[in-house]
């Protein structure tokens, strides 16, 4: 077998293996609403836990969805950049509602925007959890379901950041 044909077979195998284990992938964009709708869907369909790392968090809709998930028995933890502790954010609102919230001030900015949901799903992208991201900015969201390996990697990073935060 020629080396080029072997290389093609290896590439096809890698692509198939990667796709077969990727889980189900959804995506959305803003403006237009599909990004925020996907975030709300990921929260509303959670059953066990949501760990959210947020650079900027002012979206009332997302905060209310998290509180509704908490009422359903979903464990919620929020990790926010230290600037998110200022007024006009929902960090204080969530903390006052009993959500485990920590603020990270170990970096110039903690610029993450991701959720680990039920230890097997990941939502990430450029979308800050804000009204501006939904209505005024060009943003993206990707939601990967049923990918425990990916979720595990994001979970480890969340735990590292959460432990070093106040």
Language model segments and positions:
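Solvent-exposed loop/turn segments at secondary-structure junctions
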Residues: 56-60, 82-86, 106-109, 121-122, ...
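Structural recognition of the beta-strand scaffold that forms the well-ordered cores
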Residues: 51-53, 77-80, 102-103, 115-116, ...
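A general structural motif
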Residues: 30-35, 59
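Boundary at the C-terminal end of the N-terminal hydrophobic targeting segment
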Residues: 20-24
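Bacterial N-terminal signal peptides
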Residues: 9-18
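Signature of lipid phosphatidyltransferase scaffolds
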Residues: 122-166
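Primarily the HKD phosphodiesterase
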Residues: 41-99
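Bacterial N-terminal signal peptides that target proteins for export
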Residues: 1-10
């Amino acid at each position: 077998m020629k080396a080029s044909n072997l290389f093609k077979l290896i590439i096809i195998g890698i692509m198939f293996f990667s796709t077969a284990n990727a889980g189900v992938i959804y995506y959305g964009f803003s403006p237009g609403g599909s990004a925020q709708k996907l975030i709300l869907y990921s929260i509303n369909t959670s059953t066990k836990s949501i760990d959210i790392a947020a650079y900027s968090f002012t979206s009332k809709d997302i905060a209310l969805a998290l509180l509704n998930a908490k009422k359903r028995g979903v464990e919620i933890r929020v990790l926010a950049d230290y600037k998110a502790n200022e007024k006009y954010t929902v960090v204080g609102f969530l903390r006052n509602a009993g959500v485990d919230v920590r603020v990270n001030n170990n970096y110039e900015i903690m610029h993450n925007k991701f959720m680990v949901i039920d230890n097997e799903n990941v939502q990430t992208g450029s979308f800050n959890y804000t009204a501006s991201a939904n209505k005024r900015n060009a943003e993206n969201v990707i939601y990967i379901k049923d990918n425990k390996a990916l979720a595990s990697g994001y979970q480890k990073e969340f735990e590292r950041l959460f432990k070093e935060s106040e």
